Structures are given as C-alpha cells and as structure tokens.
C-alpha cells in the first residue's frame, strides 16, 4: 500500500514509518518537520493549508495514518482556537482530500481523554464522549467527522483511542515517563501529585504501532481503545523507573491538581478480539525507554 503518515517525523510517527516500511508499504510522510532520514519521502508543510494537503495526499494513495496534532492539554487551554485549527480543521481537509481521491482507509490517533471523568467506570468504546479539556474536545470532534464520513461516503475510518504512550525516541516529550528518565539521567526530582495513588494506563509506543497496522487492515469503520490494559499508580511507575534505571530518583510530593481523576482504567478487549496484543509490560517498556535515553541522551522538553 501507499500510505501517507501525517506527523511521521514525530515520536509515534517515526516508529509507524519504520514498521510500515518493514512490511513493504510505500510511505510518504507529511509533517511540519523534515524526517530524520533522507531516505524517506517527506513532504514538509502545514496540514491546515489545502494546497499542501493536495501535495501530500497525491493520486495513488491507498491509506492515511493521521498522527499529526497538537497534544498539549496545557496549550489547548491557553489557545483552544489554534488547537482546534490543527486538530479538527486539518483533519477535515484530509478527509475531504481522501473523499476526492477515493482513499477509503483512514486511521486516526485519538485519545482516551475524549471520555472525560467517568469516575470509577472502566473506559471502553461504549462510553459516550464527555471531554473535559479543549484538547479532548478536538479529538472527540474529529471522531464525529469520522462517523459522518464513514456513513456518508463509506470510508473505513478507524479511531484509535490511545492511553499514555511512552517509549524509545520520546526525549523531547514533556510527559511523566520522559521526566522520570531525564531525572534518572541528569539528576533532579520528579514531582508527584498528592499521595501518588492516582492510576493511569501506560502503553509502549510499538504496541500503538501494532494497533495502527490492525486499523489499516480492517477495511471498515471502527473505534478502538488502545492501552496496556493495566493501570498503575504514579508511585508504582516511579518505583519501577527507579528499579530499571538503578537510580534512586528523588520525589517531591506536591498538592494534587484540582479535578485530577483518581483513576483511568481502560478495557482493550475489543481491540484484542481483532488481534491486538500488547507486547510490553511496564518494566520491559521502561527498560527499553531507559536504554534509548542512555544511548541517545536525555534531550529536553519543548
């Protein structure tokens, strides 16, 4: 297949490009940044520009994997309009381009944040979207577009609701796993909110890529929850990071954020019935991430 990967120069994107090329797909990257390797066909531009979308998604394209997005919850709260333009308007331009060319397969990186605060309820695909942040709202809005394009134009739109993605190559990310790795590598303390018993699901990056490959092969509309299938507390994440790095990472306990959810528990069974099988548990995933940080440096958050 000829697959266009938007955001292909990013964290998940680089892994997706490598996996798709390894299985024999012809890959075109569309990104604001050049791809690290000149051997990859990378079109540099802004997906909010209709002209660039036409150049990136050219005739002969078989599928689009749409990973490009602004994913910062903080930025979405500061400038929701800019995030809406990138996460929703650009998505609609891509869908329209696919409709014009007859490209039916469209896989999208969504988020479990579309569900919002569900209390003690386990999050699965049946939970109605009730996002609490502008970022979550943009992903939910994109999912509504997919539903409409699937019903109206018979497009095989697949929304993958990722949990917290981590892994090799995340040096510039400002997520808790990346911060833990930087603390272990260069010193400094990790901030832990409240008692540290808030629980989250952390999924290794190559497991999300496996889900992308499943999505490309479905040939029908679908929404899937993609995670490790096991939620861990911040304390367990911190302690496991200390164990795999061999560093006693100091922790600063600070007041909990207002409105922070005590637990995010997801059910990945629907994806598992389609062949999804996470290969990394937390210790193995953190060990692989640490190995990459040691080999390539800690980088810094943007």
Feature annotation, model-predicted:
Residues 25-36:
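Conserved glycine-rich Rossmann-like NAD(P)H-binding loop of the short-chain dehydrogenase/reductase
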Residues 68-71, 110-111:
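Conserved NAD(P)H cofactor-binding loop of Rossmann-fold oxidoreductase domains
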Residues 184-302:
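C-terminal substrate-binding subdomain of Rossmann-fold SDR/epimerase-dehydratase oxidoreductases
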Residues 78-93, 100, 105, 114-159, ...:
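Catalytic helix-loop patch of NAD(P)-dependent Rossmann-fold dehydrogenases
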Residues 3-22:
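N-terminal Rossmann NAD(P)H-binding glycine-rich loop of SDR-like oxidoreductase domains
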Residues 41-63:
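Conserved Rossmann-fold cofactor-binding substructure of NAD(P)-dependent oxidoreductases
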């Amino acid at each position: 297949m000829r697959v266009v990967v938007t955001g292909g120069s990013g964290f998940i994107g680089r892994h997706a490009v490598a996996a798709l090329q390894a299985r024999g797909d012809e890959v075109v990257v569309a990104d604001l940044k050049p791809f690290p390797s000149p051997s990859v066909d990378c079109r540099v531009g802004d997906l909010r520009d209709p002209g660039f979308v036409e150049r990136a998604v050219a005739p002969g394209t078989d599928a689009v994997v749409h990973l490009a997005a602004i994913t910062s919850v903080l930025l979405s709260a500061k400038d929701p309009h800019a995030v809406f333009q990138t996460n929703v308007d650009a998505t609609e331009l891509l869908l329209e381009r696919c409709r014009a060319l007859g490209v039916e397969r469209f896989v999208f990186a969504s988020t479990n944040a579309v569900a919002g605060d569900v209390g003690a309820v386990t999050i699965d695909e049946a939970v109605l979207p009730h996002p609490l942040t502008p970022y979550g709202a943009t992903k939910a809005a994109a999912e509504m577009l997919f539903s409409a394009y699937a019903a109206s134009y018979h497009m095989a739109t697949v929304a993958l609701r990722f949990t917290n993605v981590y892994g090799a190559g995340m040096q510039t990310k400002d997520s808790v796993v990346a911060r833990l790795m930087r603390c272990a590598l260069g010193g400094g303390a990790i901030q832990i909110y409240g008692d540290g018993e808030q629980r989250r699901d952390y999924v290794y990056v190559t497991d999300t890529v496996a889900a992308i490959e499943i999505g490309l092969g479905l040939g029908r509309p679908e929404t899937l929850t993609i995670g490790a299938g096991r939620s861990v507390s911040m304390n367990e994440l911190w302690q496991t990071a200390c164990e795999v790095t061999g560093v006693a990472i100091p922790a600063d306990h600070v007041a909990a954020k207002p409105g922070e959810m005590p637990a995010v528990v997801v059910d990945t069974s629907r994806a598992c019935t389609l062949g999804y099988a996470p290969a990394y548990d937390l210790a193995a995933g953190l060990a692989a991430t640490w190995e990459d940080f040691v080999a390539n440096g800690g980088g810094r958050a943007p």
